[in-house]
């Protein structure tokens, strides 16, 4: 098989992985390139709709918070704006008095490390989230006063109109016009069939000093080495490309982009999910830790050990996912 990233055809290693999120258990051929390290599906299924049912986690419709008018609504926006971009004395005081912990955690998750500074995030930033599902993170940003935000996802049933100018379009990156300061791919890039075309298109849509944030699972990780086809973030067949720390920068460079920072942000999920797959337990099984933590096969102590190990792997750059911050060459 010829690598669709670097073109190498020699010595590539074949693997057979099963669909295990929903427990369909149908098999798919993958291969790993011996040159760039990218693990990729051999043949993309002609119809992927079966693997993105309405219950797929990112497609679940979120309900926007009820807008509070007057001084209360104004204060909430100031508080939440500070939670995203910590500037302003009033916002700081309001945040201290009544912090929006959900928003703070969401920002830390979506822009890990010093992502806010790297992306140059401001309330005036033009932000595009590609493959955002129903747009839960954008909804939070919009409620915090970030008005120039938009999402797009190919697998939505239809375009979502949240009101106040927030729209999540049904479509692909090619359907988006205009120029953007921040373009985000939060665990969506690996679902797309042509990484080079995607990043080239994103680079054309990016402002001169803009930033592209690509958060992806990494095959150059301890989890892949340990679990192989039972690695939970292989996620056959939805993940077409599982990049390495060599293949992603290579694609970025060909698209006219450079990697300015890599922040590892893997979690305990890489362990409990993969351990379940080894035991033929799907993510949506009633005995899954994700469905019923108390009824799962894991003790509280085991989950805590998984969390500690994930932190250690991130520190040694061996975690199974990371955020790549890209800028134009």
Predicted regions and their residues:
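A C-terminal cap/extension of S-adenosyl-L-methionine-dependent methyltransferases
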Residues: 4, 16-23, 264-329
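Conserved alpha-helix/loop element of class I SAM-dependent methyltransferases that forms part
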Residues: 81, 85-89, 93-124
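Short glycine/proline- and charge-enriched loop/turn segments
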Residues: 227-235, 276-282
